[in-house]
Amino acid sequence: MVFNKFVQVGRVVYINYGADKGKLAVIVNIINQNRILIDGEHIVRQVIPIRRVHLTKFQIDNVELNQRTVLLKKKIAKFDLTKKYAETSFAKKQAIKTKRANLGDFDRFRVMVLKKKLARTSAKSK
């Protein structure tokens, strides 16, 4: 299997740490081997360490070096990034994690009861 997720201008990244955690951005410039300049629809243009982002399989074509924010937002909208990203397995797993993290006490109790009921029915069927 060949590695094909390179750090390059136009690559879509998922921010996995910091104030913008969980948001998508696009690499606009590569500063050095550890830092990149990112910009996106819901974040401010900023320098971020590469270790704080997750490279996705998406690459937006025709993104120029230091692309202006307005033009970049148009290209992101044309690419339909949020819809394509929502269909990936990584996005689905992240949605499940956030949903489970936001459960209340009673909701966790209901999940526990349902798991017990499911275990009982599967044990009876054996």
From Swiss-Prot:
Sequence intervals crossing the membrane: none
Gene name linked to the record: RPL14
Stored PANTHER family: 60S RIBOSOMAL PROTEIN L14, LARGE RIBOSOMAL SUBUNIT PROTEIN EL14
Protein name: Large ribosomal subunit protein eL14
Cellular-component GO terms for this entry: cytosolic large ribosomal subunit
Protein family membership: Belongs to the eukaryotic ribosomal protein eL14 family.
Signal sequence, start to end: none
Coiled-coil intervals: none
Organism classification: Eukaryota, Sar, Alveolata, Ciliophora, Intramacronucleata
The entry's keywords: Ribonucleoprotein, Ribosomal protein
GO biological process: ribosomal large subunit biogenesis; translation
Matches recorded under InterPro entries: KOW, Rib_uL2_dom2, Ribosomal_eL14, Ribosomal_eL14_dom, Translation_prot_SH3-like_sf
